[in-house]
């Protein structure tokens, strides 16, 4: 029976992996041309920015609802429904662009609807991953990371090539990718329906997710770390792009910078299983955290665009190692009945805090030298590295708590054992086998 279950999990994980790859490549291909089409229709960069903002708004507004629904309803149906909704939204854009009649209202509405669908898919997908994850979860998570980085490399290149064939072609590919991904998810045999002991109100469920993340030390750490690293990385990328632009670097050189960063992430994800087989995870955490600080300090002295790109590639090579370790710990500590809500809380915090990163980078680049700006971000990474080092004992503890944590306040599942709920807030006693993958890893539009 164990062999049969492992074979089924391996098959379903492959379907999950391929569905995400097809979906992300299609979304990346259309995502790079969406602002170009909006700009061609309106002639306004502000309008193109508005469409992008509405896509983000759709995700953020829907995320809390989607997280609760992902812990109540069959997750496979939610994933398939979200993919088909996104396909319908992009089909409307496809027809309008092919007919030569797209309008700003239509593009903005489609972007918002796709953002809504994305939130639904992310929440349900994060809840489903534990059910299909093979026994060697770190290797599987590394493969997911590699898939995401590969899509970030291939998708924009494909989108640019398809755009040369016709403005509507990338949207056709995106629609097809959504439909194919929906079919692959539908073929998963594993029951993805969440465990549910008691039906409570929507607000009660939402508060339970927030409370669980805050009271579980490891989940609280991972949430803060992920938000901080995404903020710093987002600002660093904008810093490099803006600095290169002010120095007169050609667009091709800036594109090379981003490509090198993505390639570094891909290599890091592919090499993660080998690293984990030879080095203790906590050793990897300490080394990677402080090595990224050193690389950004060196970046403060870089003057050539290719040098920025090489250093970014090395930074992004290290970051998947940390991401896989932290995701694996979160998977061990999150109950099945809480996965959707926990993933939503962690992802939403990260996205909200990441939003001002481009603005901060722009202000710093305008007011300070490239050296000072890079050192500011190196200092921010040093704070994160120190925070990570201080939490090593908790990260390595079986129940995710450290010696300073009150066992009466946060038991093995991180819930308050003195509030008399006995798990009725949506938790259960099987927390040690549960888990999530953050939306940063699992996305409809990469």
Residue ranges and their predicted role:
Residues 17, 49-52, 79-80, 108, ...:
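Hydrophobic/aromatic positions within or immediately flanking transmembrane alpha-helices
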Residues 61-65, 76-78, 85, 92, ...:
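C-terminal transmembrane bundle of multi-pass solute transporters/carriers
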Residues 2-60, 211-261:
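Helix-loop boundary and gating motifs at the non-cytosolic
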Residues 15-31, 55-70, 74-89, 106-161, ...:
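Substrate-agnostic recognition of the 12-TM MFS/MFS-like secondary transporter fold
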Residues 1-14, 190-224, 406-411, 442:
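Juxtamembrane intracellular "pre-TM" segments in multi-pass secondary transporters
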Residues 35, 90-97, 159, 163, ...:
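Structural signal for membrane-spanning alpha-helices in multi-pass inner-membrane proteins
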Residues 42, 74, 96-101, 302-303:
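Helix-breaking motifs and short loop linkers at transmembrane-helix boundaries and internal kinks
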Residues 104-115, 139-193, 255, 259, ...:
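Hydrophobic alpha-helical transmembrane segments
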């Amino acid at each position: 029976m164990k062999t049969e279950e492992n074979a089924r999990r391996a098959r379903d994980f492959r379907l999950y992996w391929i569905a995400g790859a097809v979906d992300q490549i299609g979304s990346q291909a259309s995502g790079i041309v969406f602002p170009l089409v909006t700009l061609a229709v309106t002639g306004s960069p502000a309008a193109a920015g508005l469409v992008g903002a509405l896509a983000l708004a759709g995700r953020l507004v829907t995320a809390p609802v989607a997280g609760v629904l992902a812990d109540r309803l069959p997750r496979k149906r939610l994933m398939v429904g979200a993919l088909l909704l996104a396909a319908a939204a992009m089909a409307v854009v496809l027809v309008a662009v092919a007919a030569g009649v797209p309008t700003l209202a239509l593009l903005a509405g489609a972007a918002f609807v796709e953002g809504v669908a994305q939130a639904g898919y992310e929440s349900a997908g994060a809840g489903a991953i534990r059910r299909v994850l093979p026994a060697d979860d770190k290797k599987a998570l590394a493969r997911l990371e590699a898939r995401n980085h590969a899509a970030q490399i291939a998708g924009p290149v494909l989108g640019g090539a398809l755009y040369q064939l016709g403005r509507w072609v990338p949207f056709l590919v995106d629609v097809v990718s959504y439909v194919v991904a929906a079919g692959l998810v539908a073929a998963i045999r594993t029951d993805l329906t969440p465990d549910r002991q008691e039906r409570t109100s929507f607000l009660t469920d939402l508060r339970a997710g927030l409370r669980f993340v805050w009271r579980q030390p490891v989940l609280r750490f991972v949430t803060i770390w992920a938000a901080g690293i995404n903020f710093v990385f987002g600002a660093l990328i904008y810093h490099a792009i803006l600095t290169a632009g002010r120095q007169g670097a050609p667009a091709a050189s800036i594109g090379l910078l981003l490509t090198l960063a993505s390639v570094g992430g891909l290599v890091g994800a592919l090499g993660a299983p080998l690293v984990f087989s030879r080095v203790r995870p906590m050793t990897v955490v300490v080394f990677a955290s402080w090595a990224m600080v050193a690389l950004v300090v060196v970046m403060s002295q870089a003057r050539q665009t290719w040098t920025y790109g090489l250093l970014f590639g090395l930074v992004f090579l290290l970051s998947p190692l940390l991401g896989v370790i932290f995701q694996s710990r979160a998977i061990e500590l999150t109950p099945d009945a809480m996965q959707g809500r926990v993933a939503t809380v962690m992802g939403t915090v990260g996205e909200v805090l990441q939003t001002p990163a481009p603005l901060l980078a722009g202000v710093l680049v305008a007011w300070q030298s490239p050296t000072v700006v890079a050192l500011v971000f190196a200092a921010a990474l040093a704070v994160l590295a120190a925070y990570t080092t201080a939490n090593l004992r908790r990260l390595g503890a079986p129940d995710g708590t450290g010696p300073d944590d009150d066992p009466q306040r946060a038991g093995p599942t991180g819930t308050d054992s003195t509030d008399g709920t006995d798990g009725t807030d949506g938790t259960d006693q099987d927390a040690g086998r549960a888990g999530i993958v953050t939306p940063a890893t699992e996305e409809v539009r990469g």
